[in-house]
């Protein structure tokens, strides 16, 4: 399903809107159900509507995303138990709730819009959790959105307009590295700190939600200023549910760096409210401990400005679950450093679409992780400003258990940022010595490694620069085991914010080494995704300057083994930002020396793309404005293929931060590469992709300026063995942002190239880069090509193509001519060529047939799919219409129920009021009144007694009148009942008559059905016979055709087989004779044996020993004979196999002979054709010669008339004469010198032509002789081969004859031996064995029969059980219906009791009043029985009508059959009738099944109704008891 399809989008939006509206109505109805007054309920409803304004939008989004991301829902608590109110109007200064102390460290950015509030510097009272005033542009966006989230494409297009004016800001931004409170570069630096950082449900200018359209830094579902927290509304660094200025903790509301529940200035701890750097519950200056208020170095659980601990949440260094402006944790969503699922202005998450920081599917400003949306400092699960560790959330440099001045580790002692056993200046590595931020073994400036002891920013066992990890070495803000700059991950070594094993600038993820915001394995400047490498907001696999990906190492945020300036690598010593052996200015390429962000051989502006030479941050093939998208051309921030100024995508040309194929403002999609937000494979200035090599955002093996790769070494962000300024990748060297395998503007190296300056400080310039051609052919060495070709598997077509390419390369043209000296056999070559061509032809024909069949299938499938699609569309439309109708019906029901509920509430409230009034005017007031009125009542007693008597008389009269009326009604009803009983009896008689008629009709129906069935059976039999005959005829016809074809083949086989049959019949006759002889000998032997046995029996007593010996000898002989027979049989089989093999060989030889003969014939034809052509050429040349001779003769005779051609001479003789007579003739005509000279020249020419022609003739003769010799050689070779083959054939025939003779001989011997071996005992044993087997088979068959019989009996029992179950179910249904009737009767009785309760309650009621109650009960019973009888009548009438209709149908069918007659009725019509009957039977069976299910459902419903009615009976009894009690009380009171 395409998400961006207009239909699906419309359906999704409409469905979401309807769901939200239904939820809203449900909430309203539930909230209004409280037992409060009507006015209070209305007030509560208004409040709830106001509170749930944002929840509607949130729920719509949560249904799509939150279910997938269960981790982020762990701490979605409301801040201080309150729901955020509506947004205030723009340009309104909102005061903080508690007093906030202003930190000395933070500096708020210069505001672009003057009316917006700037970050608090002094203590300011705050309103309770209200969103800060958004910028005017935010207001415009709000007007467009109105709490609705629009799809990603439209957000990109709309955000182009918003960010078009801010392109200049974003172009230069990516070079800078954000520190403590100052918003990160690439974020909208102009936006103020206070107005930024809004929560998840916020809607504002630059921090918009997932599908929102707005300026940079949008929260996941938020629409607000720059840095919005998950549910936070505040400045730049807000926590999860925080609404404060920048840097707020999870539930904090305060300045820029607030902790979890902190509300204060910048860098507040978890529950701290104060200046930057506050501890967990601390309120104070920057760098507070767990409960401390102090300088900027807080310990394990402290959350403060620059140095916050494990769970601290502060301005720039927030940990796992912190959400603060520049430094937000796992679930933080803020301006500069937003967490895993955070989407804010500059740090938007996976599916966020905002200005410059969007994530995997995000299109936005800089600083996007895989699922992270945070400003420049995002770790694996941390999302914070420059200093985020695994679970660290602090200002600049907080370790797990760090306690110190500014971010010291557990055992840290020393000045700024010292390692465990290291002593040096600030920022030294493990064994490093150098300026600030040296690598693992460096000793130097702040930010030292594992065993370094430095003042600021030490982690658990780390003593180094601010925020160093366990194995991390870098500048500020290192994580749990990190050593590096600020904001490092678990084992990150880097400047600020390094990952787990990363060493780089601030803000690295778990294994991230990069500037400020790196992902899990990202290495780059601020705000890197899990595998993202880009400027500030790169996608999954993007690698770029401030935001580098998995193994990227960049300037302030270096990669896994990167060592750079403030965060240098393992053995680096040098000024700030030096590689292992590198010494260079900041941001130099491997061999580049120049401005920041130069490539290997590039000299130019910062941040150039692969083939681009443009402003900073260009894409792979991009040239254009900053931040272009994949194929987009527009404002800044473009995607994958964009070409532009800073932050260009792969091939895109346009504005900043465009989507994959989008053209718009910032907010790019999954694979978009932006300045601050680049996509997966994009390579841009600040945020380029995995295979891109460019400006400060280098790829996996790229080496470039501030964002270096795995083994790069650069000035501020250098790799392990790389020497480059900043941003060098593993083996590539280029200016900013180099890709994995890309050839960049700024000089790449092949993996085997080594440049002279590779491991020396300061690489040298190599000229302005001409963009290399990415589409240029790949040149492989010969060995690798051979190995790869050898290992590959080819098609026939592919192999043919390869052969053609190789032949073209080698310039080989295969000649069909062969010289006499050639070694190869030309006939064999011709054969091979012929076979190859035939194979090729066959394969091509097969391929063509297959392709045609596939085409037909594909066409059929296409048509079927089109039909399916059309049907599916129609179904979907119908479903949509039905759902819309259902939704409207549900809405109407909800509204009606709500109105009823409101009415009931009003009634209840009125009753309560009356009761309250009665209570107020209770017994006290009545006593007073009674005492006052006592005298009046005594005076009026006489009058009252008289009045009471008169009233009683009047009431008695009225009651008697009512009694008379009731008695009359009873009489009328009893008469009506009698009449109805008479009617019922009449109807019963009618029904009995009708039943008789029905039975008669059924009998006639059955007879007609049987007749029809018989006729149908006959017709079906005839049909089957005709079909079988038709099929047999067709089969016979096909067989006949096949037999005709086979006959022709068999005729040829018969002739050959007849000869073989004759020979075999002769052999058989001989064998038969031998068999007869053998049988005769056998019979003789048997007679001899019998006689011998008789003799043996006679002389048993004498010769037992001799007989035993003879028997033993006989058995031994028998065994020997058997072994001989077995051997002979073996030999016979072997000989047969040899004979067969010889036959096969003979056949093969014959086939080869035929092929050789055919090839010879073809060769002879070719030679003959060549001979003919040569003879023709010879004749033509001779004709030309004769013509030239005649012409020369004529010319010479014309010139020299003295020459006489009298006698017929040859041309040579004539020429000799001319030579002899020539001088004489010339002497005779001395005057004619000129013409003679001409003639001489002509003569010479003629001689030359003659010589040439003779030479040609000689050549032709030699060629003819050669060809004749060739032909003779061929004939000889063929004759020799024929002789050889003949000799072989004769030899094989001789061998065959010999083998046949031997076979015959062996067969004779075998038969003789068999005859000797056969005996009667063996035959008897065989028969007995067969009998035993037969008996076994019979026993098995009988057992099987018994098992089958048992199975049949079981099945019958099952059938009977099922029938009994059905009967039981029916009986239960009847019982329950009876019970229902009884319960209804009881109910009616109870009602009558309730109605007559007042009469029963009075003590003076006469016994005559109880009679009408019983009469009413009897009446109701009779009514119930009448209703049941009426229902039965209806059923009977319905059945009778059905029976009549079926009888009518049967009669109509009979009439049709009679009218058509048996002769006219065709087989087809009968077949259709049969089908109809079958269908009817199927329907009947299905109806029976439905009826069974309906019976079960009815049973259930009746049971439920019984239970309900019993409950009602109980309730009524209770009410009766109550009424009885109350009536008795009233009686006593009177």
From Swiss-Prot:
Residues 52-63 have a biased composition (Basic residues). Keywords: Acetylation, Endoplasmic reticulum, Isopeptide bond, Membrane, Phosphoprotein, Protein transport, Repeat, Translocation, Transmembrane, Transmembrane helix, Transport, Ubl conjugation. It is found in: Endoplasmic reticulum membrane. Residues 395-428, 474-499, 705-718 have a biased composition (Polar residues). Residues 64-88, 1059-1080, 1509-1528 have a biased composition (Basic and acidic residues). GO terms for cellular component: endoplasmic reticulum membrane. It is a single-pass type III membrane protein. The chain crosses the membrane at residues 8-28. Residues 197-736 are annotated as: 54 X 10 AA tandem repeats of [NASG]-[QL]-[GS]-[KRT]-[KR]-[AVTSEG]-[ED]-[AGVLS]-[ATGSV]-[PQLSA]. Acts as a ribosome receptor and mediates interaction between the ribosome and the endoplasmic reticulum membrane. This is Ribosome-binding protein 1.
């Amino acid at each position: 399903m395409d998400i961006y399809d207009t239909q699906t989008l419309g359906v999704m939006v409409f469905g979401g809107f309807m769901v939200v509206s239904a939820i809203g109505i449900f909430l309203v109805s539930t909230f209004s159900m409280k037992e409060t007054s009507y006015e209070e309920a209305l007030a509560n409803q208004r409040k709830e509507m106001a509170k749930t304004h944002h929840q509607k939008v949130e729920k719509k989004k949560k249904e799509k995303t939150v279910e997938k991301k269960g981790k982020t829902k762990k701490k979605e608590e409301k801040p201080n138990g309150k729901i955020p109110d509506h947004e205030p109007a723009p340009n309104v200064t909102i005061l903080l709730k508690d007093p906030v102390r202003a930190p000395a460290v933070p500096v708020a950015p210069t505001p672009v819009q003057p009316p917006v509030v700037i970050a608090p510097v002094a203590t300011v009272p705050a309103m309770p959790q209200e969103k800060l005033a958004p910028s005017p542009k935010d207001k415009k966006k709000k007007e467009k959105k109105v709490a609705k989230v629009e799809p990603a494409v439209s957000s990109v297009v709309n955000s182009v307009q918003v960010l078009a004016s801010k392109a200049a800001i974003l172009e230069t931004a990516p070079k800078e590295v954000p520190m403590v409170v100052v918003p990160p570069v690439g974020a909208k630096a102009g936006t103020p700190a206070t107005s930024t950082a809004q929560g998840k449900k916020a809607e504002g200018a630059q921090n918009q939600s997932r599908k929102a359209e707005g300026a940079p830094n949008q929260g996941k579902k938020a629409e607000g200023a720059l840095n919005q927290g998950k549910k936070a509304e505040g400045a730049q660094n807000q926590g999860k549910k925080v609404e404060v200025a920048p840097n707020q903790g999870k539930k904090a509301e305060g300045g820029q760096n607030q902790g979890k529940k902190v509300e204060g200035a910048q860098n507040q701890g978890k529950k701290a409210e104060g200046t930057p750097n506050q501890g967990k519950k601390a309120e104070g200056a920057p760098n507070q401990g767990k409960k401390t208020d102090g300088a900027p170095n807080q310990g394990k659980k402290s959350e403060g400005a620059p140095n916050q601990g494990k769970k601290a949440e502060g301005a720039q260094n927030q940990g796992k679950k912190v959400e603060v402006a520049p430094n937000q944790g796992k679930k933080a969503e803020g301006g500069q450093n937003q967490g895993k699922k955070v989407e804010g202005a500059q740090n938007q998450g996976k599916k966020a679409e905002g200005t410059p920081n969007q994530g995997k599917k995000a299109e936005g400003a800089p600083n996007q992780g895989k699922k992270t949306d945070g400003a420049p400092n995002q770790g694996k699960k941390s999302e914070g400003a420059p200093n985020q560790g695994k679970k660290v959330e602090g200002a600049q440099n907080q370790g797990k258990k760090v306690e110190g001045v500014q971010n010291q580790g557990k055992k840290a002692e020393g000045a700024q940022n010292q390692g465990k056993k290291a002593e040096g200046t600030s920022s030294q590595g493990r064994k490093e010595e150098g300026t600030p931020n040296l690598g693992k073994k460096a000793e130097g400036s702040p930010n030292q490694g594992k065993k370094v002891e430095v003042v600021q920013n030490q982690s658990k066992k780390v003593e180094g620069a601010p925020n160093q990890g366990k194995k991390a070495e870098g500048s500020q803000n290192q994580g749990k085991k990190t050593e590096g700059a600020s904001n490092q991950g678990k084992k990150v070594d880097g400047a600020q914010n390094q990952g787990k094993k990363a060493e780089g600038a601030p803000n690295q993820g778990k294994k991230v080494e990069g500037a400020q915001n790196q992902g899990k394995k990202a290495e780059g400047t601020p705000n890197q995704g899990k595998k993202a490498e880009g400027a500030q907001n790169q996608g999954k696999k993007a690698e770029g300057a401030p935001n580098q990906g998995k193994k990227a190492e960049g300037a302030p945020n270096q990669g896994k083994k990167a060592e750079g300036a403030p965060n240098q690598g393992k053995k680096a010593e040098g000024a700030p930002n030096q590689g292992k052996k590198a010494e260079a200015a900041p941001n130099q390429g491997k061999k580049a020396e120049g401005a920041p962000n130069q490539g290997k051989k590039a000299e130019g502006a910062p941040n150039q793309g692969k083939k681009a030479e443009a402003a900073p941050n260009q894409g792979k093939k991009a040239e254009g404005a900053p931040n272009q998208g994949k194929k987009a051309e527009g404002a800044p921030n473009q995607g994958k293929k964009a070409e532009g100024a800073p932050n260009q995508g792969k091939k895109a040309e346009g504005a900043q931060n465009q989507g994959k194929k989008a053209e718009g403002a910032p907010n790019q999609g999954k694979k978009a590469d932006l300045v601050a937000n680049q996509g997966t494979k994009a390579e841009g200035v600040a945020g380029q992709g995995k295979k891109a090599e460019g400006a400060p955002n280098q790829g996996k093996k790229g080496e470039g300026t501030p964002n270096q790769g795995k083994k790069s070494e650069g000035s501020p962000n250098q790799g392990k063995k790389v020497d480059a300024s900043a941003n060098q990748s593993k083996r590539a060297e280029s200016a900013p942002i180099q890709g994995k395998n890309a050839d960049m503007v700024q000089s790449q190296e092949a993996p085997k190239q080594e440049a002279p300056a590779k491991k020396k400080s300061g690489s040298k310039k190599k000229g302005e880069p001409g963009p290399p051609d990415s589409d240029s052919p790949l040149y492989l060495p010969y060995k690798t090509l051979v190995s790869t070709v050898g290992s590959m598997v080819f098609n026939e077509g592919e192999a043919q193509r390869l052969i053609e390419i190789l032949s073209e390369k080698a310039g080989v043209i295969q000649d069909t001519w062969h010289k006499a000296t050639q070694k190869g056999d030309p006939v064999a070559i011709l054969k091979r060529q012929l076979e190859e061509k035939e194979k090729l032809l066959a394969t091509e024909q097969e391929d063509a047939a297959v392709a045609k069949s596939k085409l037909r299938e594909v066409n059929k499938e296409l048509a079927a799919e089109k039909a399916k699609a059309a049907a599916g569309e129609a179904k979907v439309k119908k479903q949509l219409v039905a759902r819309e109708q259902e939704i409207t019906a549900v809405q109407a029901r909800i509204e009606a129920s709500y109105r009823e509920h409101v009415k009931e509430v009003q009634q209840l409230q009125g009753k309560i009021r009356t009761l309250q009034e009665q209570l107020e005017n209770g017994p006290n007031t009545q006593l007073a009144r009674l005492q006052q009125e006592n005298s009046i009542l005594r005076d009026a007693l006489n009058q009252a007694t008289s009045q009471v008597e008169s009233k009683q008389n009047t009431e008695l009269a009225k009651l008697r009148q009512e009694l008379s009326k009731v008695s009359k009604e009873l009489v009328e009803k009893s008469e009506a009942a009698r009449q109805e009983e008479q009617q019922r009896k009449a109807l019963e008689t009618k029904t009995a008559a009708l039943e008789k008629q029905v039975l008669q009709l059924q009998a006639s129906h059955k007879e007609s059905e049987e007749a029809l069935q018989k006729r149908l059976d006959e017709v079906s039999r005839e049909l089957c016979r005709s079909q079988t005959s038709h099929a047999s005829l067709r089969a016979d016809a096909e067989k006949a055709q096949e037999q005709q074809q086979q006959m022709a083949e068999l005729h040829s086989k018969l002739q050959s087989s007849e000869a073989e049959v004759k020979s075999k019949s002769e052999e058989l006759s001989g064998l038969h004779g031998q068999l007869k002889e053998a049988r005769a000998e056998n019979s003789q032997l048997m007679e001899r044996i019998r006689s011998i046995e008789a003799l043996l029996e006679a002389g048993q007593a004498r010769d037992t020993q001799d007989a035993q010996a003879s028997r033993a000898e006989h058995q031994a002989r028998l065994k020997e004979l058997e072994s001989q027979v077995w051997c002979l049989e073996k030999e016979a089989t072997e000989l047969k196999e040899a004979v067969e093999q010889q036959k096969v060989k003979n056949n093969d030889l014959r086939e080869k002979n035929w092929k050789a003969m055919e090839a010879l014939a073809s060769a002879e034809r070719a030679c003959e054709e060549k001979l003919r052509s040569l003879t023709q050429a010879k004749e033509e040349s001779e004709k030309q010669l004769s013509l030239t001779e005649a012409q020369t003769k004529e010319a010479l005779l014309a010139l020299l008339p003295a020459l006489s051609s009298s006698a017929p001479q040859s041309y040579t003789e004539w020429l000799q004469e001319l030579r002899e007579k020539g001088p004489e003739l010339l002497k005779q005509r001395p005057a004619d010198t000129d013409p003679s000279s001409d003639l001489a020249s002509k003569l010479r020419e003629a001689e030359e032509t003659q010589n040439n022609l003779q030479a040609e003739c000689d050549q032709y003769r030699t060629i003819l002789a050669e060809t004749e010799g060739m032909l003779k050689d061929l004939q000889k070779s063929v004759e020799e081969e024929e002789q050889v083959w003949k000799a072989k054939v004769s030899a094989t025939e001789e061998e065959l004859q010999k083998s046949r003779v031997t076979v015959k001989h062996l067969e004779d011997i075998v038969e003789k031996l068999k005859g000797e071996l056969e005996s009667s005992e063996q035959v008897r044993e065989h028969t007995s064995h067969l009998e035993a087997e037969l008996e076994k088979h019979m026993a098995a068959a009988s057992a099987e029969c018994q098992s089958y019989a048992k199975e049949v009996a079981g099945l019958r029992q099952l059938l009977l059980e099922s029938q009994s179950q059905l009967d039981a179910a029916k009986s239960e249904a009847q019982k329950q219906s009876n019970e229902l009737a009884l319960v209804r009767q009881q109910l009616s009785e109870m009602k009558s009791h309730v109605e007559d309760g007042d009469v029963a309650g009075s003590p003076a009621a006469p016994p005559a009043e109880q009679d009408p109650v019983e009469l009413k009960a009897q009446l109701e019973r009779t009514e119930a029985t009448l209703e049941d009888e009426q229902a039965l009548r209806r059923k009977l009438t319905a059945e009778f009508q059905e029976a009549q209709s079926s009888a009518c149908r049967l009669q109509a069918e009979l009439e049709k059959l009679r009218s058509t007659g048996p002769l006219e009725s065709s087989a087809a019509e009968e077949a259709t009738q049969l089908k109809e009957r079958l269908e009817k039977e199927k329907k009947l069976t299905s109806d029976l099944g439905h009826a069974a299910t309906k019976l079960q459902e009815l049973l259930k419903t009746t049971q439920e109704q019984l239970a309900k009615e019993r409950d009602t009976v109980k309730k009524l009894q209770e009410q009766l008891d109550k009424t009885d009690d109350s009536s008795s009380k009233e009686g006593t009171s009177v």
